[in-house]
A protein has these predicted regions:
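Conserved beta-strand segments of alpha/beta enzyme cores
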Residues: 35, 77-79, 143
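Short, well-ordered coil loops that connect the C-terminus of an alpha-helix to the N-terminus
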Residues: 31, 100, 118, 140-141
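Short amphipathic alpha-helical segments
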Residues: 22-25, 50-51, 106-109, 134-136
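NAD(P)+-binding Rossmann beta1-loop-alpha1 motif at the extreme N-terminus of oxidoreductases
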Residues: 1-56, 115
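Rossmann-fold dinucleotide-binding core
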Residues: 121-174
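N-terminal alpha-helical segment
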Residues: 53, 105, 154-158
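Rossmann-like NAD(P)-binding element
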Residues: 16, 41-48, 59-122, 129-130
């Protein structure tokens, strides 16, 4: 896999950080044709994220930061759903942005690593939990790393990539 093969990006966790990561990816990835899936197992979080996305895009258009056509493109390429397994199965790159609880993260990574494509890249947005604490529950730890967005993710231009001892050089290069 190379960077051109990345077509579908899934962000798991529709809290404030997950929403911003997904929107940032959808807006900045539109020139690359990314499809972005923001998912959360809690329906209430999905509803809030959908409402937030609509409001955010409308505001960007009103301020002249996006054209109406660009906002429509983002809407067409940003799916917000409660189907975490479906999102994981479709994604080429998965960014986990759920609660900072190691047990919950390990359960999620164990589940999604069995569902995702064999060459999918798995990442955690955590700044507190290194990917090496998740590697042993994944099917392919060489495709796992930390991708740490700084808050607020929609404003900050900095994303930290942290390679674990299990992470392949190829994964970092993509």
């Amino acid at each position: 896999m190379n960077a051109q093969d990345l077509k579908t990006i899934a962000v798991i966790g529709a809290g404030a950080m997950g929403q911003q990561i997904a929107m940032n990816t959808a807006i900045n990835g539109r020139k690359l044709g990314y499809n972005v899936i923001l998912c959360d197992s809690f329906e209430k979080a999905v509803e809030k994220a959908s409402a937030w996305a609509d409001t955010y895009l409308k505001g960007r258009v009103e301020k002249g930061r996006l054209t109406a056509e660009e906002a429509d493109f983002v809407k067409q390429h940003l799916t917000i759903t409660s189907d975490v397994d479906g999102a994981a199965a479709k994604a080429d790159f998965i960014i986990e942005a759920i609660i900072e609880d190691l047990k919950v993260k390990r359960e999620l990574f164990q589940r999604i690593s069995r569902i995702c494509k064999p060459d999918a890249i798995l990442s955690t947005n955590s700044s507190n939990i290194v990917s090496s604490k998740l590697a042993d529950v994944t099917e392919n730890p060489s495709r796992l790393l930390n991708v740490h967005y700084f808050n607020p993710a929609l404003v900050m231009k900095l994303v930290e990539l942290v390679k674990g001892p299990h992470t392949s050089d190829e994964t970092i290069e993509i």
